[in-house]
Amino acid sequence: MKKISLTLFAIVLAFATSYGQHFDIRAYGGFNVLQLTSDEGTSLIDGVIHDRKVSGRPGAQFGAALTFGSRFYVQPGFQYTIITSEVINENTVTKDVLKDEATINTISVPLKVGFRLINPEVENLFNARIFGGFDGSHVRSVDHSNKSNKTDDIEADDFTNLIVSADFGMGLDIFIFYVDLGYQLGLTPVYTGGDQAKANAFYSNIGLRLSF
């Protein structure tokens, strides 16, 4: 994943420099909220079936991107994301409840295309944008707040190697700052087993940009 992202950045930077494209470098941080398309299931704990429910909690992301083009632009990037979810397992016999907050750490290579409502060659201090694209994520690790050997905790190996999402939203560029609001729609299953749940997420970013 790291080699792919570095190669992609090198190719895009060489293209932008060679052909005189308007481009900028961006760094950002922000928040996200995850929601699975199928947030209910079952788990086996101590030989007893438990009803499992998963709900999203606020998470965070940090990244960098290179934007090149004029009114129409392309934006490859690299991102580190922290996703938090609460897992509730309810014993189907005793109705006892086990709660666990899982923190999922991922790296991803988002690729977006967009349209600026104002020509940046005329006005580069303020602009409004709409964008769409794809994001490929890989789960690096999973941490649990209430880990127990008695529970079948979800680990990094339980996730598919590449989780693909569609990405679309809007943004504002204001001087050297910018803000993005977006939504990711899961396209591939999150888990390696038979569960076909996909991950959707709302996110917002605020960052700095350097234009060239």
Where are these regions (language model features)?
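Structural signature of Gram-negative outer-membrane beta-barrels, strongest in the C-terminal barrel
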Residues: 100-112, 116-119, 127-142
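Bacterial Sec-dependent N-terminal signal peptides
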Residues: 1-28, 210-212
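Predominantly the C-terminal beta-signal and adjacent terminal strand-loop region
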Residues: 77-87, 156-212
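Residues that define the transmembrane beta-barrel architecture of outer-membrane proteins
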Residues: 21-23, 56-62, 103-109, 126, ...
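Short loop/turn motifs that connect adjacent beta-strands in outer-membrane beta-barrel proteins
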Residues: 19-23, 71, 118-127
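Flexible, solvent-exposed loop segments that connect beta-strands
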Residues: 35-54, 82-105, 138-160, 189-199
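Residues on the lipid-exposed face of transmembrane beta-strands in outer-membrane beta-barrel proteins
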Residues: 27-31, 60-70, 78-80, 109-115, ...
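Short glycine/proline- and aromatic-enriched beta-strand/turn motifs that initiate or cap beta-hairpins
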Residues: 19-63
